[in-house]
Amino acid sequence: MDLIKIAEEAFATKKELPSFKSGDTITVAYRIKEGNKERIQQYRGVVIRISGHGDKKRFTVRKMSENVGVERIFPIESPFIESITVNKVGKVRRAKLYYLRALTGKKARIKEKRV
């Protein structure tokens, strides 16, 4: 018996999340606790990478806020994620979109896949 696998299965959230990949624009509803109050924050941006495997899988979302790029890493199995919605399906040729960090304006746009 592998004790690590037993512990991972016990703490797994088993949420049904939509499938998405790098280049997709998604909205993550994330639960934030401030003091004794709790609220849900919507974080919308482009997925620039998906890394890890299994329960340790995580994804990085990049958004522009007041002309400043903000990146946030979310674990897939986080109990604080309320929901994930896919807004746009991007058309990219790379798995990791680190080159978006250096681009600004219209150059940083990603082509949209026709659905």
Curated annotation (Swiss-Prot):
Pfam families: Ribosomal_L19 (PF01245). GO terms for biological process: translation. Gene3D superfamilies: 2.30.30.790. The keyword Ribosomal protein applies. Keywords: Ribonucleoprotein, Ribosomal protein. One of its GO terms (molecular function) is structural constituent of ribosome. One of its GO terms (cellular component) is cytosolic large ribosomal subunit. The keyword Nucleotide-binding does not apply. PANTHER family: LARGE RIBOSOMAL SUBUNIT PROTEIN BL19M, RIBOSOMAL PROTEIN L19. Belongs to the bacterial ribosomal protein bL19 family. This protein is located at the 30S-50S ribosomal subunit interface and may play a role in the structure and function of the aminoacyl-tRNA binding site. This is Large ribosomal subunit protein bL19. It comes from Parabacteroides distasonis (strain ATCC 8503 / DSM 20701 / CIP 104284 / JCM 5825 / NCTC 11152). The gene is rplS.
